[in-house]
From Swiss-Prot:
Its EC number is 3.1.1.11. One of its GO terms (molecular function) is enzyme inhibitor activity. The keyword Acetylation does not apply. It comes from the Eukaryota. This is Pectinesterase 2. GO terms for cellular component: extracellular region; plant-type cell wall. In the N-terminal section; belongs to the PMEI family. Acts in the modification of cell walls via demethylesterification of cell wall pectin. It comes from Arabidopsis thaliana. It is found in: Secreted, Cell wall. Its main location: secreted. GO terms for biological process: callus formation; cell wall modification; pectin catabolic process.
C-alpha cells in the first residue's frame, strides 16, 4: 500500500505544478510516452484479464466472507489489493486479513518508536504512554502470530469450540490493545496532540482486527452448528459425551487437563506447595524483592515456577511480563503478605502503568496475597492489580485501592474468594473475567464522587469478553455504610460501547441504589451494552426500579444464564482444575 500512496503523491505533485512549460521537446516526449503507454496498456489488459479469470471465484468468496464484518469495504479492499493466490475458502480470507493486519501493526510499532526518538517536548506521562503502546503493540503481534498458527491447524488440532474460544480470545485481546494504547493519551490537551498522531494507524488496526474477529465468529459458529446437525444421528450417550467434552475440555482419565505436566499434577495433589524461590524482606529468603524473584524465573516455561513471598510489606511495582509464563505467587495470607505501591494518574502515570502488580505472562496464579495501591481518592486512577494473563487465577487475595482497583485488562481470568475494594470503576477492563464467592465492597470516595463497582470495556460486539460476578457479596465498607445516603453507589457504568456485565446468584446490599446502574455520559452505549441480573438477593437486589435501558435485562431462566458460567464463558473446564483452586463450572 505504501508504494501506491507514494506514486499517487508524486503524480499529484506533478499535476499541480502550474509552472510546467511544454516545450517542443516535452511534447515529443509525451508523444513517445503515449506510444509506449498504448503498448503497456495492451500488455496490462492481458495481465488484468488473467487476474480477473483467476480471481472471479476469489471475488465472490471475498465479497461473501466480508459481508459478515462491521467494516465490509475495508475487509474487501484490503485483501483484494494484495492480489496473490486465488482464495478458495473463508479460512484463507481470514488468514490473508490477519497477515495484512500484522503488517499494519508493525508499521504502528515503528511509528511509535519514531515519536519517542524524534518528537520534542514530550511530557513524562506521554513517554510512559508511548511505551505502553509499544508493549500492547508487541503483545498484539504475538496474538496475531498465534492466531495464524491456530488457524493453520483449524479444525483438526482440538475441538471446534476450543478452536473458536482461543481464536476469539486472541483477536478480542488484540482489539483491546489498540484502545489501551490510545487511552494513555486522554488525560489533558497535550496528551491528545500525541494521540492524534497515532489515531489513524491504531484505528485502522482495530478495524482490521474487528473484521477478522467477525469472520472467525461466523466461520466457527457455522462449523459448530453443522457439526451438531450431523451429530444428531449419533446416540444420546455420544451426544452427551461430546457436549461434556466441550464444557470440560480435553481431560485425561484422572480428570486433569492433558496439557498439564506430571510435575504440576504432583504439585497440585500435594498438601503443601514447594517453592522454587523465596522472597523475604528480612533477607532470610533467596530474594528481598518480588521483582528480583520474577526476573530470575525462567522464560516461556511449561512448568509451574512457584515464588513464595513471606509475610511482610513489599513496597515495589512488579511486572510479570509475557515471557514469564506459569508463574505462581504464594503468600503467607491476605493482610500478611502485602505488595503495595502508589503510582497514579495525577502524579504523571498512565492508568495502565499505575498498577502495583501487572500479570501478563500466561497461566499466572496468585493466592494468599494482598495487592494494594495507596494513592488515595484524590489521585484518580491508581491500579492495585492489572491482569492480562490468559488462563490466570487468583485465590484468597485482596485488591485494595480507590479508583480503578482491579484492571481485568484482557484474556481469560478467574477470581475466587477474593476481596476487592474501591470507589470509582474499581473493577474494570475488557477481559473475559469470572468472579466467584468474592467480597466486593465500595468504600467512601471523595466529596461529590459516585461509586461504580464495574466499568466493563467491551468495544466490539463480537468480542467474547465481559465481567461475570457469580455467588458474590456486593456491599460497602464501614466508612461508606455510615454515610451511604451521601455517596450513591451503583453496580456499574458502560466504559465502552458494548460493555457487558452479568451479576447472578449474588447478595447485593442496600448500599446499591434502586436503579442499579449509571450512565457513562448521556445516552452513550445505553442501547448497545449488555447488563444482566439473575437470581440475586439482598436489600439492593430488587429489579422493579432498575434502569429502563434497551441494553439492560433481567435473566429469567437457567438456560439464558448458563453461557455466563465459568464452564462456558471462560472455558473453565479445560484449565481451572490445574490451578488447584476451588471453582464452580455451572450455576
Amino acid at each position: 500500500m505504501a508504494p501506491i500512496k507514494e506514486f499517487i503523491s508524486k503524480f499529484s505533485d506533478f499535476k499541480n505544478n502550474k509552472k510546467l512549460i511544454l516545450s517542443s521537446a516535452a511534447i515529443a516526449l509525451l508523444l513517445l510516452a503515449s506510444i509506449v503507454g498504448i503498448a503497456a496498456t495492451t500488455t496490462n489488459q492481458n495481465k488484468n484479464q488473467k487476474i480477473t479469470t483467476l480471481s472471479s471465484t476469489s471475488h465472490a468468496i471475498l465479497k461473501s466472507v466480508c459481508s459478515s464484518t462491521l467494516y465490509p469495504e475495508l475487509c474487501f479492499s484490503a485483501v483484494a489489493a494484495t492480489g496473490g493466490k486465488e482464495l478458495t475458502s473463508q479460512k484463507e480470507v481470514i488468514e490473508a486479513s490477519l497477515n495484512l493486519t500484522t503488517k499494519a501493526v508493525k508499521h504502528n510499532y515503528f511509528a511509535v518508536k519514531k515519536l519517542i526518538a524524534k518528537r520534542k517536548g514530550l511530557t513524562p506521562r506521554e513517554v510512559t504512554a508511548l511505551h505502553d503502546c509499544l508493549e500492547t503493540i508487541d503483545e498484539t503481534l504475538d496474538e496475531l502470530h498465534v492466531a495464524v498458527e491456530d488457524l493453520h491447524q483449524y479444525p483438526k488440532q482440538k475441538s471446534l469450540r476450543k478452536h473458536a474460544d482461543d481464536l476469539k480470545t486472541l483477536i478480542s485481546s488484540a482489539i483491546t490493545n489498540q484502545g489501551t494504547c490510545l487511552d494513555g493519551f486522554s488525560y489533558d490537551d497535550a496528551d491528545r496532540k500525541v494521540r492524534k498522531a497515532l489515531l489513524k494507524g491504531q484505528v485502522h488496526v482495530e478495524h482490521m482486527c474487528s473484521n477478522a474477529l467477525a469472520m472467525i465468529k461466523n466461520m466457527t459458529e457455522t462449523d459448530i452448528a453443522n457439526f451438531e446437525l450431523r451429530d444428531k444421528s449419533s446416540t444420546f450417550t455420544n451426544n452427551n459425551n461430546r457436549k461434556l467434552k466441550e464444557v470440560t475440555g480435553d481431560l485425561d482419565s484422572d480428570g486433569w487437563p492433558k496439557w498439564l505436566s506430571v510435575g504440576d499434577r504432583r504439585l497440585l495433589q500435594g498438601s503443601t506447595i514447594k517453592a522454587d524461590a523465596t522472597v523475604a524482606d528480612d533477607g532470610s529468603g533467596d530474594f528481598t524483592t518480588v521483582a528480583a524473584a520474577v526476573a530470575a524465573a525462567p522464560e516461556k516455561s511449561n512448568k509451574r515456577f512457584v515464588i513464595h513471598i513471606k509475610a511482610g510489606v513489599y513496597r515495589e511495582n512488579v511486572e510479570v511480563t509475557k515471557k514469564k509464563t506459569n508463574i505462581m505467587f504464594l503468600g503467607d495470607g491476605r493482610g500478611k503478605t502485602i505488595i503495595t505501591g502508589s503510582r497514579n494518574v495525577v502524579d504523571g502515570s498512565t492508568t495502565f502503568h499505575s498498577a502495583t502488580v501487572a500479570a501478563v505472562g500466561e497461566r499466572f496464579l496468585a493466592r494468599d496475597i494482598t495487592f494494594q495501591n495507596t494513592a488515595g481518592p484524590s489521585k484518580h486512577q491508581a491500579v492495585a492489580l492489572r491482569v492480562g494473563s490468559d488462563f490466570s487465577a487468583f485465590y484468597q487475595c485482596d485488591m485494595f485501592a480507590y479508583q480503578d482497583t482491579l484492571y481485568v485488562h484482557s484474556n481469560r481470568q478467574f477470581f475466587v474468594k477474593c476481596h476487592i475494594t474501591g470507589t470509582v470503576d474499581f473493577i474494570f477492563g475488557n477481559a473475559a473475567a469470572v468472579l466467584q464467592d468474592c467480597d466486593i465492597n465500595a468504600r467512601r470516595p471523595n466529596s461529590g464522587q459516585k461509586n461504580m463497582v464495574t466499568a466493563q470495556g467491551r468495544s466490539d460486539p463480537n468480542q467474547n469478553t465481559g465481567i461475570v460476578i457469580q455467588n458474590c457479596r456486593i456491599g460497602g465498607t464501614s466508612d461508606l455504610l455510615a454515610v451511604k445516603g451521601t455517596f450513591p453507589t451503583y453496580l456499574g457504568r458502560p466504559w465502552k460501547e458494548y460493555s457487558r456485565t452479568v451479576i447472578m446468584q449474588s447478595d447485593i446490599s442496600d448500599v446499591i441504589r434502586p436503579e442499579g446502574w449509571h450512565e457513562w455520559s448521556g445516552s452513550f452505549a445505553l442501547d448497545t451494552l449488555t447488563y444482566r441480573e439473575y437470581l440475586n438477593r439482598g436489600g439492593g437486589a430488587g429489579t422493579a426500579n432498575r434502569v429502563k435501558w434497551k441494553g439492560y435485562k433481567v435473566i429469567t431462566s437457567d438456560t439464558e444464564a448458563q453461557p455466563f458460567t465459568a464452564g462456558q464463558f471462560i472455558g473453565g473446564g479445560g484449565w481451572l482444575a490445574s490451578t488447584g483452586f476451588p471453582f464452580s463450572l455451572s450455576l
